[in-house]
Amino acid sequence: KHTPGLKAVWVTPLRALSVEIKQAAERVADDLGTGLTVGIRTGDTSATEKNRQKAKMPDLLVTTPESLHLILATKGYEAVFKGCTAFIVDEWHELMGSKRGVLVELALGYLQNNISNLKIWGITATIGNIDEAIEVLLPNVSKKIKIVSKEKKQIEIIPVYPDKVDVLPWAGHLGGSLADKVAEIISQSRSTL
């Protein structure tokens, strides 16, 4: 049976990603019929929504490192997090080694001392040294598990140059003249960055 209250925190470095994560989590919850609720807490969250969350936290809270710290600094935060069992850090490679990453590390250390059996997930698509990333995220966790995709992607780099350059602009204007060439490459690709 579903019991209301915060069960998981999903930290993302980008507020724009928080909306996508919320929508994806809501689709899964709806498809599975779990009744789980999802909320967002960022600098963009209205005072009305913050008050609603204060009265009744969602099951999954998608937030940023800064907003998480504001919640932790709130009187009575212990009651908010008492039922939390999962902590997900998205785009860990973006946060690691930065001030925002330190905020995540401090929050995790604080929560680990107050929540027994907290499961911590670090998610990243691009990281050079995964062992170091795990150690930074989970310094006090004895059992660490890596899940690494074996999929090898073929990467093709296609430089795009103008057909003719009389004067090379200093900045900003060269890209516009290449838009048609870039659009053609994108239309022929499954995935383009």
Roles of regions detected by a PLM:
Residues 1-21, 34, 114-117:
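Conserved SF1/SF2 helicase motif Ia
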Residues 44-62:
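Conserved motor-coupling elements within RecA-like helicase/translocase cores
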Residues 13, 25, 38, 64, ...:
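Conserved structural-core and active-site-/substrate-pathway-adjacent residues in large, well-folded domains
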Residues 109, 117-193:
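Conserved interdomain linker/interface between the two RecA-like ATPase lobes of SF2 helicase motors
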Residues 14-18, 23, 44-47, 66-69, ...:
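Conserved nucleotide-binding/hydrolysis micro-motifs of P-loop NTPases
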Residues 17-42, 135-142:
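Conserved helix-turn-beta segment of the N-terminal RecA-like "Helicase ATP-binding" lobe
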Residues 10, 40, 120-122:
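Structural beta-sheet core signal
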Residues 61, 65-69, 75-120:
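SF2 helicase catalytic motif II
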